[in-house]
């Protein structure tokens, strides 16, 4: 349910946001052109997928000279940033707000804004976006070409592709819906 509260924020909203900050519940919140998007914590299936991705993507990322970061980080700047579920970085300094990433990883949650982030990622030069949907058991791998994302069969960054990844994910750890599949767009 979207909710827009115009400035100045009521004391109750300020109190809620401060409480979320204090308790560390705001880690997945995002700022979209100055508009705060308050996101709930992810479902348990999200963490199981995230751990598998860390184990599968880490070795080929390191072999390619990239830095695996399977956990939330900020892409953008203070008043306009997105928080992917993980990614791969090129070597460089650690930052609070990264200007880009080699790869952004998104794990879809019901009703989230994963697909709406693509224009932002493109504008920030994120080379590839890996989207895993645990409910649909689908892996999408997109590469940035001429300012837009296109489905790709193999990463240009690491020795992996969506078909290979979908076959390696242990979907059986998740609620039984469908057998793992790959989206071709």
Regions found by a protein language model. Give the residues of each.
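Gly/Pro/Ser/Thr-rich low-complexity, intrinsically disordered segments predominantly at protein N-termini
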Residues: 1-185
């Amino acid at each position: 349910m979207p909710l827009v509260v115009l400035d100045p924020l009521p004391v109750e909203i300020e109190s809620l946001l401060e409480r979320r900050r204090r308790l560390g519940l705001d880690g997945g919140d995002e700022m979209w052109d100055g508009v705060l998007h308050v996101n709930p914590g992810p479902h348990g299936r999200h963490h199981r997928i995230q751990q598998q991705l860390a184990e599968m993507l880490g070795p080929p990322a390191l072999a390619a000279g990239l830095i695996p970061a399977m956990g939330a980080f900020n892409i953008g700047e203070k008043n306009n940033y997105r928080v992917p579920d993980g990614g791969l970085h090129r070597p460089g300094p650690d930052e609070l707000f990264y200007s880009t990433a080699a790869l952004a990883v998104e794990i879809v949650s019901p009703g989230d804004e994963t697909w709406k982030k693509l224009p932002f990622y493109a504008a920030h030069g994120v080379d590839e976006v890996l989207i895993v949907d645990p409910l649909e058991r689908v892996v999408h791998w997109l590469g940035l070409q001429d300012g837009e994302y296109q489905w790709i069969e193999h990463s240009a960054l690491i020795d992996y592709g969506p078909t290979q990844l979908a076959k390696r994910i242990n979907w059986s750890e998740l609620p039984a819906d469908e057998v793992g599949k790959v989206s071709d767009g």
